């Protein structure tokens, strides 16, 4: 089935939850879809489609990640079975680690309401980050879950200029709509956050954009904001450089230079954070991503305060 330029491919999954490691407030990840229609040019997750059927791949670099969307039609059923196992450890689940759970396909397949009902049944703590306000459709379910378990609702907001956002995140909604969505969830018992990640060198790292994001974050009463500069690895690196060359050719050579060592130039990164830190103070914003988790679970978890939350 086609939606815009995307092909939807229903499938059944053998498991719903997958273990993750690292400095995160969750130990398990759940992806309702494989692939993402948001089409973000900086997406780190395009690699994940290389494991899908090769005859259904299109683009050489993205492997069809943006336009071949696998729909896990039985995911809620599998999730319920996994959470019902004796001795299952009740730890926070991140919903949508390598896709947006509320991308356009969700408007048609409506898998998330059943996922949320399963989470309510088992009183499971969850985290959701989305670039869509379709999540408001499920407001009542999320509100109910937030009253019996830890819930964190976040949105990636890194571009406030709409003309630029439409080029870089063509399938997402505007920053204004994302802020509005977060403000509505502030009425629940969920914690809310803004993920300004990635910050794009030469495009979104200017003071005007940062001020707009930070002031918006303050206005909606977000519990935290986290920043991370752009990492370019694997297929993402070539996809992003090709995008810059086509859309912003005047920036191409400088962008290549900034990533000449395989990562963002350290001095450039230092200058950015030197600009951003005073603005965080100005708007009295917390960058402690883990604080809501500590508040919910106590200090016996492996949590620590982060400074600007850049993974380096």
Segments predicted by a language model, with ranges:
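Surface-exposed amphipathic alpha-helices with a cationic face
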Residues: 143-146, 182-187, 277, 281
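Active-site glycine- and acidic-residue-rich loops that bind
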Residues: 133-136, 200-211
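Auxiliary Fe-S-binding modules of radical SAM enzymes
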Residues: 1-12, 18-19, 207-312
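Conserved Radical SAM active-site core
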Residues: 1-154, 158-166, 175-180
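Generic structural signal for hydrophobic
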Residues: 119, 182-185, 217
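Conserved strand-turn element in the central/C-terminal portion of the radical SAM core barrel
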Residues: 160-162, 169-171, 184-206, 230-232
């Amino acid at each position: 089935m086609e939606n815009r330029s995307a092909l939807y491919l229903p499938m059944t999954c053998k498991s719903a939850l997958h273990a993750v490691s690292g400095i995160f407030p969750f130990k398990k990840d759940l992806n309702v879809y494989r692939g993402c229609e948001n089409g973000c040019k900086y997406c780190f997750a395009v690699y994940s489609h290389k494991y899908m059927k090769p005859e259904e791949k299109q683009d050489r670099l993205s492997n069809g990640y943006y336009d071949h969307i696998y729909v896990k039609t039985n995911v809620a059923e599998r999730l319920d079975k996994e959470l019902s196992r004796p001795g299952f450890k009740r730890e926070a689940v991140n919903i949508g680690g390598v896709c947006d759970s509320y991308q356009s396909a969700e408007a048609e397949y409506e898998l998330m309401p059943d996922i949320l009902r399963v989470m309510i049944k088992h009183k499971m703590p969850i985290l959701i980050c989305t670039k869509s306000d379709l999540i408001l459709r499920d407001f009542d379910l999320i509100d109910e879950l937030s009253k019996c378990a830890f819930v964190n609702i976040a949105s990636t907001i890194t571009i406030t200029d709409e003309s630029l956002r439409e080029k870089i995140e063509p399938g997402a909604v505007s920053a204004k709509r994302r802020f509005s969505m977060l403000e509505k969830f502030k009425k629940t018992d969920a914690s809310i956050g803004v993920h300004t990640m990635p910050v794009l060198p030469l495009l979104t790292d200017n003071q005007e954009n940062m001020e707009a994001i930070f002031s918006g974050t303050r206005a909606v009463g977000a519990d935290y904001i986290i920043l991370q500069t752009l990492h370019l690895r694997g297929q993402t690196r070539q996809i992003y450089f090709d995008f810059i060359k086509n859309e912003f050719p005047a920036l191409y050579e400088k962008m290549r230079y900034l990533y000449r060592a395989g990562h963002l130039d350290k001095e450039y990164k230092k200058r950015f954070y030197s600009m951003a830190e005073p603005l965080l103070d100005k708007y009295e914003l917390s960058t402690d991503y883990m604080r809501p988790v500590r508040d919910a679970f106590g200090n016996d978890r492996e949590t620590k305060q982060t400074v600007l939350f850049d993974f380096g």
